[in-house]
Amino acid sequence: MKNKNLFLTITAFLYMIQLSAQLPKTHSIGAMKNMGTTYDLNIWLDTISNKPHLYGMGPYDKMKGEITVVNGKPYVASAFIDGAFEVGKDWDIRSPFFVYSNISKWDIFEIEGDLNNVHDIQEKVATIAKENGYNLDQPFAFKIKGEFDAVTAHIVTPRLPEVEGYREGIKSQKFSFENAHGEFIGFYSEHHQGVFTHMDGFVHVHFLMKDKTFMGHLDKISTKGKTITLYLPKNQ
């Protein structure tokens, strides 16, 4: 009996190692914690445009907006005018910090229960990932699709007077939507606080409207009794 239990333990351990090793690698450059002291541009997006299933996020240029790459398509959002935003698609852009991963296949899970804030997303992602053998010591991308009762997201704005779109005292603009259809693109890591997640959490999440007319950094969410779908990277 002891030998059987030992065999099962070793088998499970080896499976965990194999699973972790096969997850699509997450890359990051620059660091969120440096924003405010420097806005050095560390990556041109066109240098990674050859990845057909790229997912990624970071600020646009010197805090001129937000970048979200979804399945190899780069979305760029800016909000230079009070109450207004623009969303375009372009690879010829730069970012001071950026996180990305190339993911061609996903495992799909249903999320049960309400989501009332970004922390709830973090907890749901961690719980489902752990239950399905993911190693939470390794960073990974995720996405969530569905209809959401309410979503609030912001688009950062320039902090330096010499940068296009600068407005004194305004560091970002928030936009709120009800009954919003779309998807959240996110990255989970327990070891990159201040790099590509905030210091008080393990996730960095952007929201992209289904019709691609809005994109921004997720601040608030509310779902009540709706079925939403979580996608985690499939072993490759």
Where are these regions (language model features)?
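Conserved mixed alpha/beta catalytic, RNA-binding, or beta-rich assembly cores of soluble enzyme
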Residues: 80-83, 87-132, 148
